[in-house]
C-alpha cells in the first residue's frame, strides 16, 4: 500500500515535527496488544540493540503507550537518551503514530498494530516474527526486512532471533 502522508491532518504532521525535529531516529515498537500468542521479543534484546544504535550516532525512539510506566522507566534507566514520544502529547491517535513514524530513518518492530501504522510511512523497517505468519501480516513494500524465527531457526519462539540477527540488517 502506498499511503499518501499528505492525507494526514497537518496538526499531526506538525506535532510530529515538534516531537522529533531532527534526523537519525530509529523507532522501536516492542509491545503486543494481545497476549494469547507469545510474539514479544525480550525487552533486554531491545535495550541491548538500542544501546548499540546509540553508539552509531542514532537516537532510539520507543513507541510505548504512556500508561506502561514500568516498562518506560526500565528502558529509560538502561538506555540513556531514549525518546518516548507518546509521553509528549495529549493527542492519542493512529494518525499521530504514523506521522511520528514518518520522521524515523528506520523502525524495528514485532508483529503488532504499531507496526502496521509505521508500515504506512514506507520507511525502512525490520519486523520480527515468531508464531505469527510473516507472509500474511508483514507490511508489503520493498523497504521491509523480515526476521521470522520459523524460517531462520525452525522455531515459533521469537526469542531465538538474536540481537546480532537484527543488527546485521540495520
Residue ranges and their predicted role:
Residues 37-40, 73-75, 138:
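Short, well-ordered secondary-structure micro-motifs
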Residues 35-39, 154-157:
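A generic structural signal for short coil/turn motifs at secondary-structure boundaries
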Residues 40, 91, 159-161:
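Short, solvent-exposed loop/helix junctions and linker helices
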Residues 1-38:
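Mid-sequence helix-capping/hinge segment at a functional interface
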Residues 8-10, 88-93, 151-156:
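A short acidic, often aromatic-flanked loop/helix-cap motif at beta-alpha or helix-coil junctions
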Residues 45-132:
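Donor-binding and catalytic core of enzymes assembling or modifying cell-surface/extracellular glycoconjugates
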Residues 15, 45-48, 74, 96, ...:
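Alpha-helical elements of Rossmann-like donor-binding domains used by nucleotide-donor carbohydrate transfer enzymes
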Residues 116-170:
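Nucleotide-sugar donor-binding patch of glycosyltransferase catalytic domains
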